[in-house]
Every structure is written in C-alpha cells, then in structure tokens.
Amino acid sequence: MENVVIQTEFIKLQDLLKFTNLVSTGGEAKERIQACEVTVNGEVCTMRGKKIRPGDDVAFQGAHYTVSYADP
C-alpha cells in the first residue's frame, strides 16, 4: 500500500486517480469509476466526485493507496 499526501482537506476520486497516474485522463477515470473498478475503504464507489479525505483507502487494479494530509 502506498501513501498519497495531499495539502488540502480532500481530493476528488477522479483527481486522485489522475494524480497517482493510475489513469491518464479524466475521461478514463470516469469510465473506470462508473464500471465499478474502484473501491474506497473496501466498498465499490461509482461517484467520480467523491471527496477522498485523509485516512481513506483507495484501490484500483491491484494498486492500493492511503491518503494522508501534510500542512501546506
């Protein structure tokens, strides 16, 4: 499991997938999320705008990420 550090209160799920280079475009993120390929905290998530906050776990195609916060 890898750690993703954000400097904001949250990051949208589709933006997290792009930020971690799991997908290359927002369109691809939308497709993957709507195809039920992404889990958040162990549950399938189909909301691409879901707010991912520090402490959340995101998994996609065998990659697992935990989000943490760093003061700006």
Which residues fall in each region the model found?
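C-terminal structural segments of small proteins and small subunits
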Residues: 45-72
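A basic, amphipathic helix-loop patch mediating RNA/tRNA/ribosome contacts
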Residues: 11-54
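Intrinsically disordered, low-complexity regions of eukaryotic proteins
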Residues: 4, 39, 58-59
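A detector for short, charged/polar N-terminal pre-domain segments
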Residues: 1-11, 67
